[in-house]
Structure formats: C-alpha cells, structure tokens
C-alpha cells in the first residue's frame, strides 16, 4: 500500500487497479487518519 500512497502524495497517476486497492483499503478502515490527511 505504501507505494500507492506515495504516488498519491506526489500527485502521480495511478492505474485502475491501484485506485481500487486504495479505495478498498479506505472502505475497510485499513488506513490511519494521518495517512489520509496528507
């Protein structure tokens, strides 16, 4: 998950699969609020 978050922080494009993984992790509550706030 960390590489996907780093892409997000750098405003880089993500693949559809990466976006799905990120969204699923958010929905399941697997990310800390501090990770989402950046």
From Swiss-Prot:
GO molecular function annotations of the record: anthranilate phosphoribosyltransferase activity; metal ion binding
Gene3D superfamilies linked: Transferase, Pyrimidine Nucleoside Phosphorylase, Chain C
GO terms for biological process, alphabetical: L-tryptophan biosynthetic process
Enzyme Commission numbers on file: 2.4.2.18
Pathway: Amino-acid biosynthesis; L-tryptophan biosynthesis; L-tryptophan from chorismate: step 2/5
Record keyword Electron transport present: no
Alphabetical UniProt keywords: Amino-acid biosynthesis, Aromatic amino acid biosynthesis, Glycosyltransferase, Magnesium, Metal-binding, Transferase, Tryptophan biosynthesis
Reactions catalysed, as given in the entry: N-(5-phospho-beta-D-ribosyl)anthranilate + diphosphate = 5-phospho-alpha-D-ribose 1-diphosphate + anthranilate
Pfam families associated with the record: Glycos_trans_3N
InterPro entries: Glycosyl_Trfase_fam3_N_dom, Glycosyl_Trfase_fam3_N_dom_sf
Class in the EC hierarchy, top level: transferase
Family listed: Belongs to the anthranilate phosphoribosyltransferase family.
Function description: Catalyzes the transfer of the phosphoribosyl group of 5-phosphorylribose-1-pyrophosphate (PRPP) to anthranilate to yield N-(5'-phosphoribosyl)-anthranilate (PRA).
Subunit relationships: Homodimer.
The protein's name: Anthranilate phosphoribosyltransferase
Upper taxonomic lineage: Bacteria, Pseudomonadati, Pseudomonadota, Gammaproteobacteria, Enterobacterales
């Amino acid at each position: 998950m960390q590489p996907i978050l780093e892409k997000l922080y750098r405003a880089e494009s993500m693949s559809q699969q990466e976006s799905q993984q990120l969204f699923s992790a958010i929905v399941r509550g697997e990310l800390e609020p501090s990770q989402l706030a950046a």
